[in-house]
């Protein structure tokens, strides 16, 4: 054996006893270095995120709480009744033991009974403006109107929605407006300067009734409010007067807000004269001045009006210069007060006429026969507060 081979064998022997353990490597597996982490299992191919928007889930169908009202065409008479603002506090009585304004008004109890009786007898409210139209022959009363199936039309108006300051502490509310929570309400001024809010007025009682009986309102019709202006509107001093110069602008804005609320609910407005004058006693100049005040002080709050409701029911006739002045101002339908219901056209097609019956202490006692088709007066009158 050569010297070189002997040295090589000696080196191999020394390595075998050096304490290093040899690593056996399979010829089938590639070596893995210690400083490289073992790769995770292959999860398979991953799709790229779609750029298309995901479809929104279909909304669940809403369940309507308002019943569907079906309509039909009605041909026949259309009665027109009216009230004044309600007696909210019938306990306030005069020396005769009756409510103040006993002959001219009804109270909240009577108004609720009235609505119930009208509904039971098949009536529903319609908008007075839906009862007439402009045709090729001029203005004409419509021969038919649309009403909920099985119901009969009724026009219902409210006179003097002004809340005259002279009537404070007489059992009526003092104004319509909004409370500290922004809720539409009525209020009275207490002697200590505080305000007491109440819902004992026609608008709130009617809204509650329609919420319960939706078909009492045809096409969302409500009442027609007959406005004067000599002592403001809705309890606010919107009239031009030396006593309210400093507050008038603010009062107008408050009144406008109330008018907007009424319109949103479906109420309409009619003119009841600015000064609530007997038209038959006004001169032509006096009538023109009254109409000017309506245009300048009332319509800016409630909007344009085409229906004129005669104060005291005192009427003028076509051809009268004062009547012509009202036509020139834009009025078309003229309403009086009577103990029977009547509507008519005029041959010239320039205007229309209808009567109304007031619902008040006087008529409840004296017009039972005329009102019998609508309701039984004995079911309405509040005998506890009327003698």
At which residue positions do the language-model features occur?
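Ser/Thr/Gly/Pro-rich low-complexity, disordered linker/stalk segments of secreted
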Residues: 32-64
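Hydrophobic core
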Residues: 10-15
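Positively charged n-region of N-terminal signal peptides that target proteins for export
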Residues: 1-5, 9
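C-terminal active-site subregion of NodB/CE4 polysaccharide deacetylases
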Residues: 60-128, 140-157, 163-168, 264, ...
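Active-site beta->alpha N-cap acidic-glycine motif
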Residues: 73-261, 265
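Sec-dependent signal peptide cleavage junction
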Residues: 17-34
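Short, catalytically relevant binding-site loops at active-site mouths
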Residues: 230-233, 275-278, 314-315
């Amino acid at each position: 054996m050569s010297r070189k081979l002997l040295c090589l064998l000696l080196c191999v022997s020394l390595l075998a006893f050096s304490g290093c353990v040899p690593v056996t490597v399979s010829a089938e597996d590639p070596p893995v270095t210690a400083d490289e982490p073992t790769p995770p299992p292959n999860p398979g191919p991953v799709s790229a995120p779609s750029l298309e928007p995901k479809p929104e889930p279909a909304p669940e169908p809403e369940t309507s709480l308002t019943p569907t009202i079906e309509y039909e065409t009605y041909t026949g008479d259309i009665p027109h009744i009216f009230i004044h603002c309600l007696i909210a506090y019938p306990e306030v009585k005069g020396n005769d033991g009756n409510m103040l304004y006993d002959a001219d008004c009804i109270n909240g109890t009577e108004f609720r009974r009235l609505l119930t009786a009208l509904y039971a007898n098949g009536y529903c409210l319609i908008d007075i403006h839906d009862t007439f139209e402009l045709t090729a022959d001029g203005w004409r009363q419509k021969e038919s109107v649309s009403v909920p199936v099985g119901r009969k039309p009724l026009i219902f108006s409210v006179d003097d929605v002004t809340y005259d300051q002279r009537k404070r502490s007489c059992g009526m509310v003092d104004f319509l407006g909004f409370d500290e929570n922004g809720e539409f309400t009525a209020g009275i001024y207490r002697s200590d300067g505080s305000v007491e809010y109440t819902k004992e007025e026609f608008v709130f009682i009617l809204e509650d009734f329609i919420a319960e009986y939706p078909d009492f309102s045809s096409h969302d019709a409500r009442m027609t409010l007959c406005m004067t202006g000599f002592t403001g509107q809705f309890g606010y001093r919107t009239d031009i007067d030396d006593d309210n110069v400093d507050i008038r602008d603010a009062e107008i804005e408050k009144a406008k807000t109330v008018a907007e609320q009424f319109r949103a609910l479906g109420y309409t407005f009619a003119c009841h004269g600015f000064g609530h004058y007997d038209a038959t006693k006004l001169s032509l100049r006096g009538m023109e001045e009254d109409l000017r005040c309506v245009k300048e002080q009332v319509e800016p709050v409630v909007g344009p009006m085409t229906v004129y409701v005669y104060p005291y029911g005192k009427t003028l006739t076509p051809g009268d210069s004062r009547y012509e002045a009202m036509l020139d101002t834009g009025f078309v339908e003229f309403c009086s007060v009577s103990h029977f219901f009547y509507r008519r056209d005029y041959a010239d097609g320039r205007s229309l006429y209808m009567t109304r019956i007031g619902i008040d202490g006087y008529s409840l006692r004296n017009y039972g026969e005329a009102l019998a088709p609508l309701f039984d007066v004995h079911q309405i009158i509040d005998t506890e507060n009327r003698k």
